[in-house]
Regions:
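Basic/aromatic-rich interaction segments and small domains that mediate binding to polyanionic partners
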Residues: 12-57
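Intrinsically disordered, low-complexity, charged/polar segments
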Residues: 42-84
């Protein structure tokens, strides 16, 4: 899982489209069971075109954190979370 302050590039998996898809995002907060808060920017400069959005954790998504690729997913009920 990524941490606060990480810059991520969101990429939809299996055609699922979400707010931050294809933009560079900075993780700014986490809350609840279902959402992670991020800042999405349209350029490498974090002061340009900032917007806030949220990513649903219960959809499988692929992120690229600079050169490292990883997937995460949430499966089953609230007490049965699996992260890869």
């Amino acid at each position: 899982m990524f941490n606060l302050g990480d810059l991520i590039i969101g990429k939809p998996d299996n055609g699922y489209s979400y707010t931050c898809g294809g933009t560079i995002c900075k993780v700014v907060k986490k809350w609840g069971e279902n959402y992670i808060g991020v800042i999405c920017v349209k350029s490498d400069n974090p002061f340009i075109q900032r917007t806030e959005c949220s990513l649903p954790e219960d959809e499988k998504m692929v992120f690229e954190v600079w050169s490292s690729r990883f997937e995460f997913f949430k499966s089953g009920k609230k007490n049965n979370k699996t992260w890869i």
